[in-house]
Amino acid sequence: MGEGRARWFVIGGIAAVIVLVIVINFYDDIPILKDYMADRIGSWLNKDLTDTDKRWQTNHSLFALGSGGFFGSGLGNSKQKYFYVSESHTDFIFSIIGEELGFVGCCLVLGLFALLILRGIYIGMRARDRFGALLAFGIMVQIGLQVALNVAVVTDTLPNTGISLPFFSYGGSSTLVTLGEMGFLLSVSRQADLPRLYSF
C-alpha cells in the first residue's frame, strides 16, 4: 500500500514538472518574474556592469559592514543608516549592526541565533508527541532560513529578497509572527521531558 502511494506521488511530481516546463517554454505572455525581480537578479549577477543606482542599497550595505571593522564604530554611531542604506531598520539592519558593533557584534548576534536554534531543536527532540516535535523543528527551520537569507542578502551572497531579520528588524506582522512562534515553542517545552531548574 505504501509503495503504490509513493509511486503515484513520484509520477505526479514528474508530470507537474513536465507541464511547468511546457507552459514556461511555449507561453511567453506569462510573466514569471516581474521587472524589479529581474533587475535585482541581473544586478546581482553582473556586479561590475550594473548601473550604480540599481546596486545602491547593496553597495552601501557592504560599505557599512566593511567600515565597522572588528569592534565597530559604537552603538548609535552609524553613518550609512542616514539615507545611504535604505530600509536600514528593516531588511538591512544586519549591515548597521556590523557598522556599529563590528565583526564581534555580528558574531554575537549570529551566535545568539545559533543558541536559539540549538535549544529549539533540543526541545523538539524531547517533545512529548510527534506534533510538538514537528512544530519545534519547523519553527527552528523557518527562523534559521530567515536569518541565513537575510545575512546572505546583506553580504551580497544572494540577490535582494526583502526578508527581515527575526527579532531585530522593525515590522509589526513579522515581529508578531515570530513572537507567536516563540510562544508555541515555549508551550512545547513546557510539556517536554526537560530537566527542571526550578520547582515551582
Q: Over which residues does each language-model region extend?
A:
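Membrane-water interface at transmembrane helix exits
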Residues: 23-27, 121-125, 145, 149, ...
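Hydrophobic, glycine- and aromatic-enriched re-entrant/interface helices and adjoining loop segments
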Residues: 6-106, 128-131
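Transmembrane helix-bundle signature of multi-pass membrane transporters/permeases
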Residues: 84, 99, 139-143, 171-174
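A juxtamembrane structural motif centered on a specific transmembrane helix
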Residues: 146-200
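Hydrophobic transmembrane alpha-helices and their immediate junctions
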Residues: 103-147
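Hydrophobic alpha-helix feature that most strongly marks membrane-spanning transmembrane helices
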Residues: 46, 66, 116-122, 126-129, ...
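Membrane-interfacial segments
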Residues: 26-27, 31, 121-128, 161, ...
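Structural signal for the C-terminal ends of transmembrane alpha-helices
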Residues: 1-6, 115-124, 186-193
